[in-house]
Every structure is written in structure tokens, then in C-alpha cells.
């Protein structure tokens, strides 16, 4: 999935920023979170996050749900490099495995109505 953050900022600028962030906040992870192109759930109000390294994927999903004010009947899925990370995985482990060359972890979220509408 193509990141609009990557297309807006040149590689060197992104790399410099992620290095500055990881030096200043050593136990935090720089994450870029963007909505999947064809998803029908709301756009997120900010896409750059500084996530505690001991946060689980499930806890991060909860943060995203709250930020986009997603109703309980809607499901949300997050993808890292087009794969669904395990809910119990630590964000630090996901970061180590999937971080981009620029130092950011790119997360895409998507949703679907799992319960249907009445």
C-alpha cells in the first residue's frame, strides 16, 4: 500500500526526522498511521505517532479506534507491510521486523462492518 507521507516528504527528511525522534525518545517508536485507500471508515486526524515500545498491537488499535471515533459495531484491522500483525505482539517487535529504511513503521488501517446493518 502506498503511503502519502512517503510521497509528501523526501527520504532524507524522513530519515533525519526518525533518527532525531529515536535519539530523543529512546523507548518510543515512530509510527506513521494512514487509512487504506478504499476503506469506508473515517480518516484519522493525525498520522504521526510516538508509541511506547511496550504497547501491544491491540492497545495501538484501541488508540486508533478512539481517534477516529469508530462505532463499536465496526471492525478495524491494521496492516504492516500488507500483513496483519498479531494483536498480542509488542509494537517494538513489529517495529524491529517491519520498520522502513527511513526509520518509521508504516501502519495502514482499514475496516468493515462485521455485524451488518438493520
Swiss-Prot record:
One of its GO terms (cellular component) is fungal-type vacuole membrane. InterPro entries: Atg8-like, Ubiquitin-like_domsf. It holds the Pfam family ATG8. A lipid is attached at residue 116 (Phosphatidylethanolamine amidated glycine). Its main location: membrane. Ubiquitin-like modifier involved in autophagosome formation. With ATG4, mediates the delivery of the autophagosomes to the vacuole via the microtubule cytoskeleton. Required for selective autophagic degradation of the nucleus (nucleophagy) as well as for mitophagy which contributes to regulate mitochondrial quantity and quality by eliminating the mitochondria to a basal level to fulfill cellular energy requirements and preventing excess ROS production. Participates also in membrane fusion events that take place in the early secretory pathway. This is Autophagy-related protein 8. It comes from Vanderwaltozyma polyspora (strain ATCC 22028 / DSM 70294 / BCRC 21397 / CBS 2163 / NBRC 10782 / NRRL Y-8283 / UCD 57-17) (Kluyveromyces polysporus).
